[in-house]
Amino acid sequence: MSANGPAAEPADGGRAVPAGGGEAVPAGGGRAVPAGGGEAAGTVVAVVGPTAAGKSALSIALAHALDGEVVNADSMQLYRGMDIGTAKLTTGEREGVPHHLLDIWPVTEPASVAEYQRLARAAVDDILARGRVPLLVGGSGLYVRAVLERFEFPGTDPAVRARLEAELAQAGPAPLHARLRAADPDAAASILPGNGRRIVRALEVIELTGAPFTAALPDPSPYYRSVQVGVDLDTAPLDERIALRVDRMWADGLVAETRALAAQGLAGGRTASRALGYQQVLRFLAGELTETEAHQETIRATRRFVRRQRSWFRRDPRIAWLDSAGSGLVADALRAVRAAAR
């Protein structure tokens, strides 16, 4: 389950990304012209929505129906070895559907939305060039928008960043979050008060650009022809599904997986260490929580995260929302895709 919030900050795009891991994404640039046909040819299909709502299952069904390939848009499934806690589909569960941008970074690599954008667009362009349909699938809202929309990333200033990080280390995130709330209430509402790294980035962008951080979010003008299908459930059944999912993760070995990743530097990973489930287990391993407390806090934190995901996605009127509990989910999703592709 991704804990990189739905409005994660734009990061600098200069960091090198390892070439290995997962399924290779061919290099490329620009938007390729589709070489083949199909009813959704030339259209990027995004499957979005909150954690545990059923995005992965729907994406597999759509990929089979549309001759598609999945491009991951879950910020934590980018990390190698973070499998159980992110509900990453196994090879068998992918049912032969090619998946791109899984397992590309070590857990010590800080997230970069700019690097993700570059890699994801290369994957999308390659899929389109082969006449197939790209399915952009995940609950990391900014990652989805950074691919689908025209989005230039603000620069960085090492001196400004260092000064803000020094303030964070000395005073903690609360006064910085209060400053952000005064300068940009919308940004403050989307960033948790304890998430110092994202608060620092937002304040840095405001200082460098003289504009609200939210002004740096994607321009809604499209980069690709696309359709966004959102899947969701009523709160009560989704809350129950989250609890069952966390129970299953514990049974499947989340503690052992986290312990193995801790040996690879997970606790020092600025992004990966904040992933839901993993951060709670790390606290258990450090003696800060009992295992029962870590388990229950994972459920509570995931439910809170789902509320923020909903708030992010529901602001976008272009998303066609579907009830993932409905018996006609796949047929309804295909109708939405076909209508947009006409």
From Swiss-Prot:
Presence of keyword Nucleotide-binding: yes
Annotated positions binding ATP: G49, P50, T51, A52, A53, G54, K55, S56
UniProt-listed Gene3D superfamilies: 1.10.20.140, P-loop containing nucleotide triphosphate hydrolases
Recorded catalytic activity of this chain's protein: adenosine(37) in tRNA + dimethylallyl diphosphate = N(6)-dimethylallyladenosine(37) in tRNA + diphosphate
Binding positions for substrate per the UniProt entry: T51, A52, A53, G54, K55, S56
EC number: 2.5.1.75
InterPro entries, alphabetized: Dimethylallyltransferase (IPR039657), IPT (IPR018022), P-loop_NTPase (IPR027417)
Record carries keyword Nucleus: no
MF-aspect GO terms: ATP binding; tRNA dimethylallyltransferase activity
Subunit and partners: Monomer.
Similarity field: Belongs to the IPP transferase family.
NCBIfam families, per the entry: miaA
Name this polypeptide is given: tRNA dimethylallyltransferase
Source species of the chain: Salinispora arenicola (strain CNS-205)
